[in-house]
């Protein structure tokens, strides 16, 4: 079969004949009786997939923008079964992209051209200008990027899987990620950036510190200790840590020392296990998120962000003295986000409000809006940035890593 949608045992196939019928039809196809029965008892996303295919074939008649067309293509890829995702190929050209879906034999079953909108991803273009790509990056024997983090770094949808595809399930979140596309971890490890294998333990909701069983949320979510316990250290890894925001924003903890010390203890564990390269990242200024700006705890969030980063940086300096043969660096995430926010403001992006106020959960029976992959907003929701901001962050971080970990 050309395309299978759904996951695990709950899959549904879309034949090449169905593709052709959708292409020739002026109306959105209806589900067959058997397809309706499967959709009723199992979540196959068959109807959503057919709608995406219809929108792709008929984007001109529907007056869809290039962003909406790309959104339909990305959503269809997210709905496709795991073994079919390699059938989706984007061929980039000078003024347009060709969006392709192939069958099992490598033949095109869908191929459309979409122009590159000059205003799309304007923020990423600005950051690219100020942070030109480093040339001839050589990271020595580093072959893997290993990530420990929370929803900012969760590229595998770990919280999505843990909550049985509930958090986040709203249409403005892509493939179980807490953003409207890809995360900075995926960009950074991709062939267009550092081109390294990615090993990602990050999970949405994760905290830096461990909390007692008397705290139900603390018991449910992951933390640095649990993530590190799942990891087998290697001297060929660059271990990257970005945690702490949920301790202050989600669990409303204020023991900065406990939050930082837990992270440092776990960093020492992997160093003892053989890791030679570590990058420790501070948290963004939590008071600058739409949630923080309108919260009664705005000042508290700002103070905690500053205190956390100052203490974390001091501890990293102590680690560098304790392990002089290792490459251990601290990255000021808050400064990077300030640069991105300023650039966004200068070109007219909304830096104050979230793109969506809906929340994380899809309401059964409701029709979610089309996924927008590049709105001119810094924040996709009240606390999480858009994928474009993730891309900008990866651009800046690539320059930092090239400068501090390169062997040339």
UniProtKB/Swiss-Prot annotation:
<keyword id="KW-0378">Hydrolase</keyword>
<dbReference type="Pfam" id="PF00657">
    <property type="entry name" value="Lipase_GDSL"/>
</dbReference>
<keyword id="KW-0843">Virulence</keyword>
<keyword id="KW-1035">Host cytoplasm</keyword>
<dbReference type="Pfam" id="PF06767">
    <property type="entry name" value="Sif"/>
</dbReference>
<comment type="function">
    <text>Effector proteins function to alter host cell physiology and promote bacterial survival in host tissues. This protein is required for endosomal tubulation and negatively regulates the formation of Salmonella-induced filaments (Sifs) in epithelial cells. Has both deacylase and esterification activities in vitro, but esterification is probably the dominant activity in host cells. Significantly contributes to cholesterol esterification, which reduces cellular cholesterol in cells and abrogates the ability of SifA to associate with cholesterol and LAMP-1 vesicles.</text>
</comment>
<dbReference type="GO" id="GO:0034736">
    <property type="term" value="F:cholesterol O-acyltransferase activity"/>
</dbReference>
<protein>
    <recommendedName>
        <fullName>Secreted effector protein SseJ</fullName>
        <ecNumber>3.-.-.-</ecNumber>
    </recommendedName>
</protein>
<dbReference type="InterPro" id="IPR001087">
    <property type="entry name" value="GDSL"/>
</dbReference>
<dbReference type="GO" id="GO:0033644">
    <property type="term" value="C:host cell membrane"/>
</dbReference>
<comment type="subunit">
    <text>Interacts with RhoA and indirectly with SifA.</text>
</comment>
<dbReference type="InterPro" id="IPR010637">
    <property type="entry name" value="Sif"/>
</dbReference>
<comment type="similarity">
    <text>Belongs to the 'GDSL' lipolytic enzyme family.</text>
</comment>
<dbReference type="GO" id="GO:0047178">
    <property type="term" value="F:glycerophospholipid acyltransferase (CoA-dependent) activity"/>
</dbReference>
<dbReference type="GO" id="GO:0016298">
    <property type="term" value="F:lipase activity"/>
</dbReference>
<dbReference type="GO" id="GO:0044174">
    <property type="term" value="C:host cell endosome"/>
</dbReference>
<dbReference type="InterPro" id="IPR036514">
    <property type="entry name" value="SGNH_hydro_sf"/>
</dbReference>
<dbReference type="GO" id="GO:0031267">
    <property type="term" value="F:small GTPase binding"/>
</dbReference>
<feature type="active site">
    <location>
        <position position="381"/>
    </location>
</feature>
<dbReference type="GO" id="GO:0005576">
    <property type="term" value="C:extracellular region"/>
</dbReference>
<feature type="active site">
    <location>
        <position position="384"/>
    </location>
</feature>
<feature type="active site" description="Nucleophile">
    <location>
        <position position="151"/>
    </location>
</feature>
<keyword id="KW-0964">Secreted</keyword>
């Amino acid at each position: 079969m050309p395309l299978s949608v759904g996951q695990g045992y709950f899959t549904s196939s879309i034949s090449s004949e169905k593709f052709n019928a959708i292409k020739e039809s002026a109306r959105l196809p209806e589900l067959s009786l058997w397809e309706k029965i499967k959709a009723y008892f199992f979540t196959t996303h068959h109807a959503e997939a057919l709608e995406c295919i219809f929108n792709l074939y008929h984007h001109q008649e529907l007056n869809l923008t290039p962003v909406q067309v790309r959104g339909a293509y990305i959503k269809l890829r997210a709905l496709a079964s795991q073994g079919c995702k390699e059938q989706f190929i984007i061929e980039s050209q000078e003024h347009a992209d060709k969006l392709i879906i192939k069958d099992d034999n490598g033949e095109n079953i869908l191929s459309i051209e979409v122009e590159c909108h000059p205003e799309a991803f304007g923020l990423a273009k600005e950051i690219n200008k100020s942070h030109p790509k480093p040339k001839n990056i050589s990271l020595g024997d580093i072959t893997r990027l290993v990530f420990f983090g929370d929803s900012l770094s969760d590229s595998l949808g770990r919280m999505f899987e843990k909550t049985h595809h509930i958090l986040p399930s709203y249409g403005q979140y892509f493939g179980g990620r807490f953003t409207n596309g890809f995360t900075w971890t995926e960009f950074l490890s991709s062939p267009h950036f550092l081109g390294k294998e990615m090993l990602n333990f990050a999970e949405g909701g994760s905290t830096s510190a461990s909390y007692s069983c008397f705290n139900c949320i603390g018991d449910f979510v992951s933390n640095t200790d649990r993530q590190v316990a799942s990891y087998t250290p290697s001297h060929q890894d660059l271990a990257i840590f970005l945690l702490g925001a949920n301790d202050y924003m989600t669990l409303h903890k204020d023991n900065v020392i406990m939050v930082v010390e837990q992270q440092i203890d776990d960093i020492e564990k992997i160093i003892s296990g053989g890791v030679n390269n570590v990058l420790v990242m501070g948290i963004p200024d939590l008071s600058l998120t739409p949630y923080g700006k309108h919260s009664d705890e705005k000042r508290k969030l700002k103070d905690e962000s500053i205190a956390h980063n100052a203490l974390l940086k001091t501890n990293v300096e102590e680690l560098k003295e304790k392990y002089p043969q290792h490459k251990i660096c601290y990255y000021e995430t808050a400064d990077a986000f300030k640069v991105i926010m300023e650039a966004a403001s200068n070109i007219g992006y909304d830096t104050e409000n979230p793109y969506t106020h809906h929340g994380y959960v899809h309401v059964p029976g409701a029709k979610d809006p089309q996924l927008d992959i590049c709105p001119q907003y810094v924040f996709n929701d009240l606390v999480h940035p858009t994928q474009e901001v993730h891309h900008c962050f990866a651009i800046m971080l690539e320059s930092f890593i090239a400068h501090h970990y390169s062997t040339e």
